[in-house]
């Protein structure tokens, strides 16, 4: 399976805890195509680092 770099264009929600993990809702762009997703983190500190331009794999 191939992974694609995605970049956050807008943070929709602040970090919130659900199912024992921390989540952040974001809008992103990958290969020129916009999308929405929920990013999962192990700690609140990691989730708070998400800002515009944050890179993740999708």
Q: Where are the language model's segments positioned?
A:
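A short, charged, amphipathic alpha-helix used as a generic interaction element across diverse proteins
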Residues: 40-58
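Short beta-strand segments
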Residues: 35-39
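Short aromatic-glycine motifs in intrinsically disordered, low-complexity regions
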Residues: 1-2
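Short amphipathic beta-strand and strand-loop transition segments with alternating hydrophobic
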Residues: 6-17
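Short aromatic-glycine-(Arg/Gly/Cys) micro-motifs in beta-strand/loop hairpins
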Residues: 15-34
